[in-house]
């Protein structure tokens, strides 16, 4: 943060983040630097920075771990985003079901203010940036950016029509940058070590590392941070220790309810945005659910369809009807 404020060059910060090829870790993989640059170019009286910590995919707890273990990396990333885009106000939207993360964030915000890293005139630079917490009530749909903004505004968490990008018209109709926890946690390291350092990790199009929550039928469940492009087989067998009881692996599910179940004959696929898309799955926020030979894929499909039906906002009747119809044949 000190380096950014000393150089006092918003465009340079956006350029460094663009050159690093940092992409959103919330699932979509949109280039972070392009998003910041778009918000920076908006000429308006107010802009906002939002951290999406509404982690809702079954089995995923990457954001919770970062918020509990290193909240200052997220706050610093948000403040740098605020400087780069011209925003002076930020919000962290976090699940109320994460009480330890909430308590840790509250403490971290006070610590940052006490050390002049948040608030007014940060480090004597004239830059002001404040962060507020907003607690989500557990609705999965609020993980969608515009639904999250509706919730912050005190409304029902319903996705908006995408007439404008949120960098043009977001929170309270003002330009807004929204990234997830892991994305912000990477920012300070990129500023400190440089774009080339970050690009040296991972693949050409998917730079850096990714945190995955390795859960399910696995000997060593837990959080795993690996370079983008690491093979699924390396994560499941080398890091995860394989399947309990010497049983055979059947599949790995990535991408949450909207993702896909990847069979063992595709375990040589790299964990990066492009490779997963090629085989019909997605990165998602980082949940990896391992299934063994005893798991029934019909039951797995039923579970995710039921989850999607239960958590649907119901805004588009044809969408909800389609989900229900998909669910009926396998009930």
Role assignments for model-derived ranges:
Residues 1, 51-63, 166-171, 213-219:
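Gly-rich Lys/Arg/Thr-decorated short loops/hinges at beta-loop-alpha junctions or inter-strand turns
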Residues 22-31, 140-142, 250-258, 281, ...:
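Local cysteine-cluster metal-coordination motifs and their immediate loop/turn environment
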Residues 70-84:
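Histidine-anchored nucleotide/phosphate-binding helix
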Residues 77-81, 228-245:
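Short amphipathic, charge-patterned alpha-helical segments
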Residues 320-331:
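Single conserved hydrophobic/aromatic residue that forms the stacking wall/gate
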Residues 102-228, 240:
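Hydrophobic alpha-helical positions that pack around
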Residues 1-17, 179-194:
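Flexible inter-domain linker/hinge segments
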């Amino acid at each position: 943060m000190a380096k950014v404020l000393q150089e006092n060059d918003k465009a340079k910060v956006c350029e460094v983040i663009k050159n690093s090829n940092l992409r959103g870790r919330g699932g979509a993989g949109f280039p972070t630097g392009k998003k910041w640059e778009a918000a920076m170019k908006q000429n308006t009286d107010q802009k906002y920075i939002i951290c999406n910590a509404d982690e809702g995919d079954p089995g995923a707890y990457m954001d919770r771990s970062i918020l509990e273990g290193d909240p200052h990396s997220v706050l610093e990333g948000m403040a740098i985003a605020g400087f780069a885009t011209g925003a002076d106000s930020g919000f962290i939207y976090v699940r109320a079901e994460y009480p330890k993360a909430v308590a840790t964030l509250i403490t971290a915000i006070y610590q940052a203010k006490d050390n002049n890293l948040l608030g007014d005139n940060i480090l004597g630079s004239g830059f002001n940036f404040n962060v507020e917490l907003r607690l989500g009530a557990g609705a999965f749909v609020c993980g969608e950016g515009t639904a999250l903004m509706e919730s912050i505004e005190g409304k029902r968490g319903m996705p908006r029509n995408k007439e404008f990008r949120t960098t043009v018209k977001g929170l309270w109709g003002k330009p807004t940058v929204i990234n997830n926890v892991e994305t912000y946690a990477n920012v300070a390291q990129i500023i400190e070590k440089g774009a080339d350092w970050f690009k040296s990790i991972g693949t050409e199009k998917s730079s850096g590392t990714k945190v995955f929550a390795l859960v399910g039928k696995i000997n060593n469940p837990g959080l795993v941070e690996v370079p983008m492009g690491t093979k699924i087989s390396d994560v499941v067998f080398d890091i995860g220790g394989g399947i309990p009881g010497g049983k055979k692996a059947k599949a790995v599910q990535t991408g949450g309810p909207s993702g896909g179940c990847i069979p063992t004959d595709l375990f040589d696929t790299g964990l990066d945005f492009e490779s997963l898309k090629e085989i019909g799955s997605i990165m998602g926020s980082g949940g990896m659910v391992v299934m063994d030979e005893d798991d029934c894929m019909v039951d797995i499909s039923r579970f995710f369809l039921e989850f999607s039906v239960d958590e649907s906002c119901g805004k588009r009747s044809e969408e909800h009807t389609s989900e229900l119809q998909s669910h009926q044949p396998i009930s």
